[in-house]
A protein has these predicted regions:
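Short histidine-centered beta-strand/loop micro-motifs
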Residues: 69-71, 82, 103, 125-126
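Hydrophobic beta-strand signal
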Residues: 77-79, 92
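Thr-Gly-centered strand-to-loop micro-motif
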Residues: 61, 79-80, 102, 116
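PDZ-domain C-terminal substructure recognizer with occasional recognition of PDZ-binding tails
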Residues: 100-124
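Short aromatic-glycine motifs in intrinsically disordered, low-complexity regions
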Residues: 92-94, 122-132
Length: 149
């Protein structure tokens, strides 16, 4: 809490200061915002955030495929673990051993479309009849912390 220095007295809390409750979640590594990259987990690093953010872990974004959603290279995205997400939700997903952050859409033919928020990137389709890759939703993006000022 910011303090107001008082001459000859102990400092007093600033009258407009709002106390913020913080906690830490593991920063598990990086996630692709571009082409999927190998998913590695490192539980030794954590990142602080407010108690009001309901998430289980964080990932550092690599790439520019989500810039139209205001998620930039180097940003930290906070993920709430869940197996399914609603259409259009930004989610961390795993394709085989590669993780990526994209908007997720379920198509009428049963496939999943993973759509970037940058028109320079083509959608990724998974789950077709000839697709032997494994696909899993890791969780929903619930917040992000930007390094851009």
């Amino acid at each position: 809490v910011p303090m107001i220095p008082q001459q000859g007295k102990e400092s007093l809390p600033h009258p407009e200061a709002i106390p913020v409750s913080r906690r830490s979640v593991p920063l598990l590594g990086s996630i692709a915002c571009g082409e999927p990259i190998f998913a590695d987990e490192d539980y030794s690093v954590s990142v602080a955030l407010g108690h009001d953010v309901d998430c289980d872990f964080a990932l550092r974004c690599k790439g520019d495929s989500m810039i139209e959603a205001r998620i930039y290279d180097g940003d930290i995205v906070f993920i709430k673990k869940q197996d399914f997400v609603d259409d259009g939700t930004i989610a961390a997903v795993l394709i085989d051993d590669d993780a990526t952050l994209k908007r997720v859409y379920k198509l009428s033919d049963g496939r999943i479309e993973l759509r970037a928020a940058n028109e320079r990137y083509r959608p990724i389709f998974v789950g077709g009849p000839d697709d032997t890759r494994t696909f899993r939703v890791l969780g929903k993006a619930v917040a992000f912390q930007s390094t851009i000022l």
